Design a protein with these regions (language model features):
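Structural signature of tandem alpha-helical TPR/SEL1-like repeats
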Residues: 52-55, 91-106, 136-154, 181-194, ...
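Canonical positions in the second alpha-helix
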Residues: 63, 111, 155-156, 194-195, ...
């Protein structure tokens, strides 16, 4: 749980205000007043703008220094590090991407040490192990991290089987795993659709659904899914890159 220390409102408001000052055109979510930190993390996710990410990372590290036992702060830091990973992968900077995924893993594992009942944290950990496979030599990284992906997704599902992030991560597991080790494109589509049934606003999940349809050979459904993603988040370079790859 988040700390109730008196310094928190000022720090959280500062984090969100700093992001809005960097991206003044970004609309403030309705929930920003109730959860300024969550709103700041979501604003950074939508754009993957590096200055936003750097500002938010600095704010989170300051909060963690003052509240080192707050599991939620470590989870937010892990998310921000994953967004850095996306940025570096887009640039094809494999070294920086490798450092970012390791930092994300460290933060997420610390979150789970403090609170092992977070479905979001276990789900993110599964995704990060999957990213380790994609960044490494699949012949060696697959056997090392593949079982961990499956284990963390199972933990997340046991904790919250109505969580859209949990279903999306399971979909990525089915999509990215080789068929001989349990990969299943049809199950990945089913999982992504289940995620979207719980939360239809998840643009990234629609991109992954498009990737599944593309792998299945259904380009029409792939284009439709990614067009919905672009409509939901037109400012995301990751979404735009996915759309371009399907054209």
């Amino acid at each position: 749980m988040r700390s109730s220390k008196s310094s928190y409102p000022r720090l959280l408001a500062g984090a969100y205000a700093a992001l809005l000052s960097i991206a003044p055109g970004a609309p403030a979510p309705v929930s920003a007043a109730d959860d300024p930190l969550g709103a700041a993390v979501e604003a950074a996710r939508k754009t993957h703008e590096e200055k936003q990410l750097q500002s938010l990372k600095a704010q989170l590290e300051q909060m963690i220094a003052q509240n080192p036992n707050d599991a939620g702060l470590y989870l937010d830091l892990a998310k921000v590090q994953e967004y850095f990973l996306d940025v570096y992968e887009t640039r094809r900077d494999k070294k920086a991407a490798g450092e970012a995924v390791d930092k994300a893993l460290d933060a997420d594992q610390r979150c789970i040490q403090l609170n092992d009942k977070s479905a979001d944290a276990h789900s993110l950990l599964a995704d990060l192990y999957g990213r380790k496979i994609s960044l490494g030599n699949a012949m060696f990284a697959g056997p090392k991290f593949g079982p961990k992906v499956k284990e963390e997704n199972a933990k997340a599902m046991a904790l919250d089987d109505k969580n859209p992030r949990v279903w999306a991560s399971l979909g990525r597991q089915y999509l990215m795993t080789p068929k001989m080790f349990g990969g299943d494109v049809a199950k990945s589509i089913e999982s992504f659709q289940k995620s979207l049934a719980f939360d239809s606003s998840r643009d990234e999940t629609r991109v992954w659904l498009a990737k599944s349809f593309q792998k299945q050979g259904d380009r029409a459904k792939a284009r439709d899914a990614v067009q919905h993603a672009v409509a939901l988040n037109p400012d995301s370079p990751w979404v735009r890159n996915a759309a371009n790859s399907l054209n």
